[in-house]
Amino acid sequence: MTTPIDETQVFPPAREAEIAALMVDAVDLHCHSGPAAMPRILDHLEATLDAEAAGFSALVFKDHYYLGSNHCAMMEKLMPDLKVRLFSGIALNNACGGINPHAVDHAIRLDGKIVWMPTLAAKNHIDQSAKATKNFPSASKPMLKAIPLTVLDANGALTDETKQVLDLIAEGDIILAGGHLHVSEQVKLFEEAIARGVRKMLVNHPTYVIECSDEDIRSFASMGVHMEHSICMFVDGRGYKWGGDRLAELIGLAGIDRTVLSSDLGLTGSPRPVEGFRRVLNTLLDQQFTHAQIRTMISTNGLHLLNLA
Protein backbone atom coordinates (compact mmCIF):
# COMPACT_ATOMS: atom_id res chain seq x y z
CA MET A 1 0.00 0.00 0.00
CA THR A 2 1.32 3.46 -0.90
CA THR A 3 2.08 5.73 2.05
CA PRO A 4 0.08 8.99 1.95
CA ILE A 5 2.35 11.81 0.88
CA ASP A 6 1.75 13.76 4.10
CA GLU A 7 2.76 10.88 6.37
CA THR A 8 6.05 9.27 7.34
CA GLN A 9 6.77 6.18 5.28
CA VAL A 10 7.59 3.16 7.44
CA PHE A 11 10.41 0.84 6.38
CA PRO A 12 11.58 -2.46 7.89
CA PRO A 13 13.57 -1.86 11.12
CA ALA A 14 16.97 -2.55 9.59
CA ARG A 15 16.29 -0.18 6.68
CA GLU A 16 14.92 2.47 9.06
CA ALA A 17 18.18 2.38 11.03
CA GLU A 18 20.22 2.52 7.83
CA ILE A 19 18.32 5.55 6.55
CA ALA A 20 18.48 7.35 9.91
CA ALA A 21 22.26 6.94 10.03
CA LEU A 22 22.66 8.23 6.48
CA MET A 23 20.53 11.30 7.22
CA VAL A 24 23.05 12.55 9.78
CA ASP A 25 25.05 15.47 8.32
CA ALA A 26 22.80 15.72 5.24
CA VAL A 27 22.58 19.05 3.41
CA ASP A 28 19.49 20.41 1.65
CA LEU A 29 20.43 23.17 -0.80
CA HIS A 30 16.87 23.65 -2.09
CA CYS A 31 14.22 23.88 0.66
CA HIS A 32 10.99 25.60 -0.37
CA SER A 33 9.49 26.36 3.03
CA GLY A 34 7.44 29.47 3.72
CA PRO A 35 6.32 32.16 4.11
CA ALA A 36 6.00 32.42 0.35
CA ALA A 37 3.76 33.92 -2.30
CA MET A 38 2.71 30.41 -3.27
CA PRO A 39 1.23 27.82 -0.88
CA ARG A 40 3.75 25.87 1.21
CA ILE A 41 3.15 22.91 3.51
CA LEU A 42 5.59 24.11 6.19
CA ASP A 43 7.39 27.25 7.24
CA HIS A 44 11.09 27.92 7.79
CA LEU A 45 10.85 27.14 11.51
CA GLU A 46 9.17 23.79 10.92
CA ALA A 47 11.70 22.90 8.23
CA THR A 48 14.52 23.82 10.60
CA LEU A 49 13.15 21.69 13.44
CA ASP A 50 12.65 18.73 11.08
CA ALA A 51 16.23 19.02 9.81
CA GLU A 52 17.62 19.42 13.32
CA ALA A 53 15.79 16.32 14.52
CA ALA A 54 17.18 14.30 11.61
CA GLY A 55 20.74 15.49 12.28
CA PHE A 56 21.22 17.59 9.13
CA SER A 57 24.34 19.73 8.83
CA ALA A 58 22.86 22.54 6.74
CA LEU A 59 19.64 23.81 5.22
CA VAL A 60 19.30 26.42 2.46
CA PHE A 61 15.97 28.20 2.15
CA LYS A 62 15.01 29.11 -1.39
CA ASP A 63 12.26 31.53 -2.27
CA HIS A 64 11.65 32.78 -5.79
CA TYR A 65 11.02 36.33 -4.58
CA TYR A 66 13.16 37.15 -1.55
CA LEU A 67 16.48 36.60 0.20
CA GLY A 68 15.87 34.55 3.37
CA SER A 69 19.12 35.29 5.18
CA ASN A 70 17.38 37.52 7.73
CA HIS A 71 15.14 34.60 8.75
CA CYS A 72 18.22 32.42 9.17
CA ALA A 73 19.98 34.95 11.37
CA MET A 74 16.97 35.44 13.62
CA MET A 75 16.27 31.72 14.05
CA GLU A 76 19.90 30.99 14.87
CA LYS A 77 19.86 33.79 17.44
CA LEU A 78 16.63 32.55 19.02
CA MET A 79 17.83 28.93 19.02
CA PRO A 80 21.54 29.14 19.89
CA ASP A 81 21.83 25.39 20.45
CA LEU A 82 20.88 24.54 16.86
CA LYS A 83 23.34 22.20 15.21
CA VAL A 84 21.92 22.58 11.70
CA ARG A 85 23.35 25.62 9.90
CA LEU A 86 20.80 27.84 8.18
CA PHE A 87 21.42 29.69 4.92
CA SER A 88 19.58 31.27 2.02
CA GLY A 89 20.29 32.90 -1.31
CA ILE A 90 18.74 35.14 -3.91
CA ALA A 91 16.82 34.24 -7.06
CA LEU A 92 17.25 36.92 -9.72
CA ASN A 93 13.60 37.37 -10.66
CA ASN A 94 11.65 40.58 -11.21
CA ALA A 95 11.03 41.10 -7.47
CA CYS A 96 14.72 41.92 -6.89
CA GLY A 97 15.15 43.82 -10.15
CA GLY A 98 16.09 40.86 -12.32
CA ILE A 99 19.76 40.25 -13.07
CA ASN A 100 20.72 42.95 -10.61
CA PRO A 101 24.33 43.23 -9.37
CA HIS A 102 23.22 45.48 -6.50
CA ALA A 103 20.84 42.79 -5.21
CA VAL A 104 23.60 40.19 -5.47
CA ASP A 105 26.09 42.41 -3.64
CA HIS A 106 23.57 42.90 -0.83
CA ALA A 107 22.83 39.17 -0.65
CA ILE A 108 26.51 38.28 -0.33
CA ARG A 109 26.98 40.84 2.46
CA LEU A 110 24.11 39.15 4.35
CA ASP A 111 25.85 35.76 4.03
CA GLY A 112 23.80 34.57 1.06
CA LYS A 113 25.26 31.31 -0.21
CA ILE A 114 23.59 30.83 -3.61
CA VAL A 115 22.71 33.13 -6.48
CA TRP A 116 20.04 31.51 -8.62
CA MET A 117 19.73 32.92 -12.10
CA PRO A 118 16.10 33.77 -13.03
CA THR A 119 13.62 31.04 -12.16
CA LEU A 120 9.92 31.89 -12.48
CA ALA A 121 10.75 35.02 -14.48
CA ALA A 122 13.20 33.29 -16.82
CA LYS A 123 12.10 33.57 -20.44
CA ASN A 124 12.62 29.83 -20.71
CA HIS A 125 10.35 29.18 -17.71
CA ILE A 126 7.64 31.45 -19.10
CA ASP A 127 7.86 29.73 -22.49
CA GLN A 128 7.66 26.31 -20.82
CA SER A 129 4.71 27.43 -18.70
CA ALA A 130 2.74 28.06 -21.87
CA LYS A 131 2.94 24.38 -22.71
CA ALA A 132 -0.01 22.32 -21.53
CA THR A 133 2.33 19.59 -20.24
CA LYS A 134 3.74 21.84 -17.51
CA ASN A 135 2.09 22.29 -14.11
CA PHE A 136 4.19 24.79 -12.20
CA PRO A 137 3.11 25.93 -8.71
CA SER A 138 1.37 29.28 -8.82
CA ALA A 139 0.98 32.15 -6.36
CA SER A 140 -1.86 32.08 -3.83
CA LYS A 141 -3.06 35.44 -5.17
CA PRO A 142 -2.57 36.91 -8.65
CA MET A 143 0.72 38.75 -9.12
CA LEU A 144 1.97 41.16 -11.74
CA LYS A 145 2.79 39.48 -15.03
CA ALA A 146 6.44 38.45 -15.11
CA ILE A 147 8.84 40.32 -17.38
CA PRO A 148 10.81 37.58 -19.22
CA LEU A 149 14.48 37.53 -18.29
CA THR A 150 17.51 36.11 -20.06
CA VAL A 151 21.26 36.38 -19.49
CA LEU A 152 21.85 36.94 -23.22
CA ASP A 153 21.67 40.12 -25.27
CA ALA A 154 20.18 40.45 -28.76
CA ASN A 155 23.41 39.08 -30.26
CA GLY A 156 23.43 35.98 -28.06
CA ALA A 157 26.27 37.18 -25.81
CA LEU A 158 26.12 37.45 -22.03
CA THR A 159 24.88 40.83 -20.83
CA ASP A 160 27.17 43.18 -18.93
CA GLU A 161 24.95 42.86 -15.84
CA THR A 162 25.34 39.09 -15.93
CA LYS A 163 29.12 39.41 -16.14
CA GLN A 164 29.14 41.77 -13.17
CA VAL A 165 27.05 39.29 -11.19
CA LEU A 166 29.54 36.55 -12.05
CA ASP A 167 32.40 38.72 -10.79
CA LEU A 168 30.58 39.25 -7.49
CA ILE A 169 29.93 35.53 -7.12
CA ALA A 170 33.58 34.76 -7.81
CA GLU A 171 34.74 37.34 -5.29
CA GLY A 172 32.33 36.03 -2.65
CA ASP A 173 33.23 32.41 -3.43
CA ILE A 174 29.58 31.37 -3.32
CA ILE A 175 27.43 29.16 -5.51
CA LEU A 176 26.20 30.10 -8.99
CA ALA A 177 23.02 28.19 -9.84
CA GLY A 178 21.53 28.18 -13.32
CA GLY A 179 17.95 28.60 -12.13
CA HIS A 180 15.40 28.00 -14.88
CA LEU A 181 17.50 29.28 -17.77
CA HIS A 182 17.52 27.05 -20.84
CA VAL A 183 20.51 24.74 -21.23
CA SER A 184 21.69 26.81 -24.21
CA GLU A 185 21.96 29.85 -21.94
CA GLN A 186 23.58 27.91 -19.13
CA VAL A 187 26.39 26.65 -21.36
CA LYS A 188 27.46 30.24 -22.07
CA LEU A 189 26.84 31.24 -18.46
CA PHE A 190 29.07 28.58 -16.94
CA GLU A 191 31.81 28.99 -19.54
CA GLU A 192 32.03 32.69 -18.68
CA ALA A 193 31.73 31.97 -14.97
CA ILE A 194 34.74 29.67 -15.07
CA ALA A 195 36.73 32.27 -17.00
CA ARG A 196 35.89 34.84 -14.31
CA GLY A 197 36.92 32.62 -11.41
CA VAL A 198 33.63 31.16 -10.20
CA ARG A 199 34.43 27.84 -8.51
CA LYS A 200 31.06 26.57 -7.26
CA MET A 201 28.39 25.92 -9.88
CA LEU A 202 25.08 24.09 -9.92
CA VAL A 203 22.52 23.11 -12.56
CA ASN A 204 19.09 22.85 -10.92
CA HIS A 205 16.90 19.89 -11.99
CA PRO A 206 18.74 19.50 -15.34
CA THR A 207 16.13 17.25 -16.93
CA TYR A 208 13.13 19.41 -16.01
CA VAL A 209 12.51 22.82 -17.60
CA ILE A 210 16.23 23.18 -18.36
CA GLU A 211 16.02 20.52 -21.12
CA CYS A 212 19.48 19.05 -20.62
CA SER A 213 20.28 16.00 -22.71
CA ASP A 214 22.37 13.18 -21.30
CA GLU A 215 25.34 14.57 -23.21
CA ASP A 216 24.74 18.05 -21.76
CA ILE A 217 24.93 16.57 -18.26
CA ARG A 218 28.21 14.82 -19.07
CA SER A 219 29.59 18.02 -20.55
CA PHE A 220 28.62 20.19 -17.59
CA ALA A 221 30.12 17.68 -15.15
CA SER A 222 33.37 17.67 -17.12
CA MET A 223 33.47 21.46 -16.65
CA GLY A 224 33.20 21.04 -12.89
CA VAL A 225 29.51 21.94 -12.63
CA HIS A 226 27.41 19.96 -10.15
CA MET A 227 24.06 18.50 -11.18
CA GLU A 228 21.40 19.10 -8.53
CA HIS A 229 18.59 16.57 -8.85
CA SER A 230 15.34 17.49 -7.12
CA ILE A 231 14.19 14.78 -4.73
CA CYS A 232 10.57 15.87 -5.29
CA MET A 233 10.78 14.44 -8.81
CA PHE A 234 11.76 10.96 -7.62
CA VAL A 235 9.34 10.40 -4.71
CA ASP A 236 5.56 10.10 -4.62
CA GLY A 237 3.79 13.44 -4.76
CA ARG A 238 2.87 16.32 -7.00
CA GLY A 239 6.39 16.71 -8.36
CA TYR A 240 6.99 13.03 -9.21
CA LYS A 241 8.46 12.50 -12.68
CA TRP A 242 10.78 9.48 -12.71
CA GLY A 243 11.60 6.29 -10.83
CA GLY A 244 14.76 4.98 -9.25
CA ASP A 245 16.18 3.53 -12.45
CA ARG A 246 16.25 6.95 -14.12
CA LEU A 247 17.76 8.55 -11.03
CA ALA A 248 20.55 5.97 -11.09
CA GLU A 249 21.13 6.71 -14.79
CA LEU A 250 21.35 10.44 -14.16
CA ILE A 251 23.81 9.96 -11.32
CA GLY A 252 25.92 7.81 -13.61
CA LEU A 253 26.05 10.53 -16.27
CA ALA A 254 27.64 13.16 -14.01
CA GLY A 255 29.28 10.85 -11.51
CA ILE A 256 28.95 10.73 -7.73
CA ASP A 257 31.36 13.61 -7.16
CA ARG A 258 29.37 15.96 -9.40
CA THR A 259 25.88 15.00 -8.17
CA VAL A 260 23.88 16.71 -5.43
CA LEU A 261 20.47 15.60 -4.21
CA SER A 262 18.32 18.37 -2.74
CA SER A 263 14.69 18.24 -1.73
CA ASP A 264 13.05 21.05 -3.79
CA LEU A 265 10.19 20.29 -1.42
CA GLY A 266 7.71 22.38 0.50
CA LEU A 267 5.17 22.49 -2.32
CA THR A 268 1.65 21.30 -1.65
CA GLY A 269 0.72 17.72 -2.45
CA SER A 270 4.19 16.42 -1.61
CA PRO A 271 6.14 15.14 1.41
CA ARG A 272 8.00 17.48 3.73
CA PRO A 273 11.67 17.99 2.82
CA VAL A 274 13.16 15.63 5.42
CA GLU A 275 10.62 12.94 4.58
CA GLY A 276 11.55 13.35 0.93
CA PHE A 277 15.16 12.65 1.86
CA ARG A 278 14.12 9.50 3.75
CA ARG A 279 12.21 8.19 0.76
CA VAL A 280 14.90 8.91 -1.81
CA LEU A 281 17.53 7.27 0.42
CA ASN A 282 15.42 4.14 0.39
CA THR A 283 15.37 4.34 -3.41
CA LEU A 284 19.15 4.80 -3.59
CA LEU A 285 19.71 1.81 -1.31
CA ASP A 286 17.37 -0.26 -3.49
CA GLN A 287 19.50 0.84 -6.46
CA GLN A 288 22.58 -0.60 -4.71
CA PHE A 289 24.40 2.66 -4.08
CA THR A 290 26.90 2.34 -1.24
CA HIS A 291 26.71 4.33 1.97
CA ALA A 292 29.83 6.26 0.95
CA GLN A 293 28.34 7.16 -2.43
CA ILE A 294 25.08 8.30 -0.85
CA ARG A 295 26.86 10.44 1.75
CA THR A 296 28.86 12.11 -1.00
CA MET A 297 25.69 13.11 -2.86
CA ILE A 298 23.58 14.23 0.11
CA SER A 299 26.26 15.64 2.40
CA THR A 300 29.90 15.95 1.28
CA ASN A 301 29.26 17.74 -2.01
CA GLY A 302 26.82 20.18 -0.44
CA LEU A 303 29.17 20.94 2.45
CA HIS A 304 31.93 21.72 -0.04
CA LEU A 305 29.69 24.02 -2.06
CA LEU A 306 28.73 25.90 1.12
CA ASN A 307 32.38 26.20 2.19
CA LEU A 308 31.67 24.09 5.27
CA ALA A 309 34.18 21.36 4.38
Give the positions of each predicted feature.
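An N-terminally biased module of ancient metal coordination in phosphate/nucleic-acid-related enzymes
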Residues: M1-V84
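Acidic (Asp/Glu)-rich catalytic clusters
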Residues: A20, C72-K83, D105-D111, D167-I169, ...
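Divalent metal-dependent hydrolysis catalytic cores, especially in the metallo-beta-lactamase
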Residues: D28, E46-N70, K83-N93, G112-L120, ...
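Active-site beta-loop-alpha junctions enriched in small/polar residues
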Residues: H30-G34, H64-Y66, G89-A95, P118-A122, ...
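Extended substrate/RNA-proximal surfaces in nucleic-acid metabolism proteins
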Residues: K83, N94-V203
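Catalytic pocket-lining loop regions of alpha/beta-barrel enzymes
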Residues: D167, G172-K241, V260
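Short acidic/histidine-rich active-site segments
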Residues: I256-P273
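Mid-to-C-terminal alpha-helical segments outside catalytic/metal-binding sites
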Residues: G276-A309
